Regions:
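N-terminal secretory signal peptides that target proteins for export/translocation
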Residues: 1-12
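Short, threonine-centered small-residue motifs that mark membrane-proximal processing/anchoring sites
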Residues: 16-17, 21-32, 146-157
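Short N-terminal leader segment in a subset of presequences, especially plant chloroplast
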Residues: 10, 20, 24, 40-43
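N-terminal segment immediately downstream of the Sec signal-peptide cleavage site
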Residues: 31-69, 74, 153-155
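Compositionally biased regions
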Residues: 6-8, 21, 106
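Acidic, low-complexity intrinsically disordered segments
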Residues: 76-155
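Generic early N-terminus positional signal peaking at residue ~5-7
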Residues: 6, 17, 35-36
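Short, surface-exposed loop and linker segments with low hydrophobicity and enrichment for Pro/Ser/Thr
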Residues: 25-33, 54-62, 90-105
Length: 157
């Protein structure tokens, strides 16, 4: 009786494996990869981020991960949406990006750097001139800057 029961287990395992593999390929991707960069007076940053695969009603994608560097310093983390980078209290990020200009929202996205500093690029429509600005914060040294930058982000095909 044992050999007979054991032989039924192999086809069942194969069937489960086939169903599992089919399910993996049946679902669409849950993330998009982007390449981004910005440059301005005293700053150059670039890298990649991942977003959810579908935009919201305004065409913005939620940024879920980030990597790269700013002025040669490694990015170590993405600032959670709804929170402010240290040194920029009262200005929470929303972590959104889109394919059309302006690509960033008023709140932008934020990230931490390996040297203990932070950055928050955002679209400042109320600034003169309107455009993308990158707030930089160095909390230990109580320094900040906010240069106008040229920002680009594209979805990796």
């Amino acid at each position: 009786m044992c050999p007979r029961n054991g032989s039924r287990g192999i086809p069942l395992k194969r069937a489960l494996l086939i169903v599992s593999l089919a399910a993996l390929f049946a679902f669409p991707a849950e993330a998009l990869e982007w390449r981004w960069s910005y440059q301005g007076e005293g700053v150059a940053a670039s890298g990649a981020f991942t977003t959810k695969d579908a935009p919201n009603a305004d065409g913005f994608y939620d940024i879920t991960g980030i990597k790269g560097e700013m002025n040669g310093v490694a990015i170590t983390g993405l600032q959670p949406a709804g929170t402010s980078i240290p040194g920029n209290d009262g200005y929470p990020v929303d972590g959104l990006v889109r394919t059309v200009v302006p690509q960033l929202s008023l709140h932008g996205f934020g990230y931490s750097l390996a040297d203990g500093t932070y950055a928050n690029p955002f679209y400042g429509d109320h600034f003169v001139p309107p455009g993308v600005y990158a707030f930089f914060s160095d909390p230990p040294n109580r320094k900040t800057s906010e240069p106008l930058v040229k920002f680009t982000a594209t979805i990796v095909p």
